[in-house]
From Swiss-Prot:
Disruption phenotype: In cells missing this gene some GerQ multimers are present, indicating that tgl is not essential. Heat treatment for 20 minutes at 60 degrees Celsius, which maximally activates the Tgl enzymatic activity, causes cross-linking of GerQ in isolated yabG-deleted spores but not in tgl/yabG double-mutant spores. Additionally, the germination frequency of the tgl/yabG double-mutant spores in the presence of L-alanine with or without heat activation at 60 degrees Celsius is lower than that of wild-type spores.
Name recorded for this polypeptide: Protein-glutamine gamma-glutamyltransferase
This protein's record includes keyword Ion transport: no
Pfam families named among the record's database cross-references: TGL
């Protein structure tokens, strides 16, 4: 369900809305779901719809970029824009344009390798650039460190549930992973459509394919399969909207 300024948005309320055709299915799905989305204004709602579609597009762009998967300790990037911290974070160099540095990852992917959690943050930034434009992005995010979302300035939250939406970040957990290959303890993914996910390092796959891949990296004698957690990680759109408007 969608609540705008304390008022429930009903299906009949949007019948005459003039919005991009590709936003309609997502809008209707959000209205009909039991998951509650709260906004201060219609502008915030439209911002979320566009941002989610751009997250999907950004995930597909990163998939095609040639950027590779690497553990945090083996992270690397284009040294024109980024330095790598001892922890494996990509830190934006002083006076480098943030939007140009982020776009470089998509345009020159073979110069980059990073963890799947880092990939999610990069996807969020790529989507934001396409949603708000380079000038607003550069003004709002002048100091960027790409690591994971627990280290991030972006307002991000995770909540439990079984209802997922385009652009959600989900997690496939591998509880009996091989300790020698700990990077396969799980996989962060972006939901691209019904049973279609982008998983950095694996590609665009369905849920069974991701689970089969993770199961191939279990410890010897493992009995428990990898599985999709009942939770979603999302951008806090009302908070983000106040940052970038």
């Amino acid at each position: 369900m969608i609540i705008v300024s304390g008022q429930l948005l009903r299906p009949q309320d949007i019948e005459n809305w003039q919005i991009d055709q590709d936003l309609n299915p997502l809008l209707k799905e959000m209205i009909e779901t039991p998951v509650q989305f709260d906004y201060h204004s219609i502008a915030e709602l439209m911002f979320e719809l566009k941002l989610r579609m751009n997250i999907v597009a950004a995930a597909k762009t990163l998939h095609k970029s040639g950027a590779k998967f690497a553990t945090f300790l083996k992270t690397y990037g284009n040294t024109t824009y980024w330095r790598v911290s001892p922890e494996g974070a990509l830190e934006l160099k002083y006076r480098m344009p943030p939007s140009k540095a982020i776009r470089d990852i998509a345009e020159n992917g073979p110069f980059y390798a990073f963890e799947c959690a880092t990939a999610i943050v990069i996807i969020y930034y790529l989507a934001l650039i396409d949603t708000i434009g380079e000038d607003k992005f550069n003004a709002s995010f002048d100091r960027i460190i790409l690591y994971d979302w627990h280290y991030e300035k972006l307002p991000i939250y995770t909540e439990t549930g079984h209802h997922f939406f385009l652009g959600d970040c989900l997690y496939f957990k591998n509880p009996e992973f091989d300790p020698q290959k700990a990077q396969w303890r799980g996989e962060n993914v972006i939901l691209l459509g019904e049973d279609k996910y982008f998983a950095h390092g694996l590609g665009i796959l369905n849920g069974k394919q991701i689970i089969d891949k993770l199961n191939s990296f279990r410890k010897k004698g493992a009995l428990q399969s990898a599985y999709l957690l009942s939770q979603a990680t999302r951008l806090d759109v009302p908070s983000l909207f106040r940052i970038v408007r």
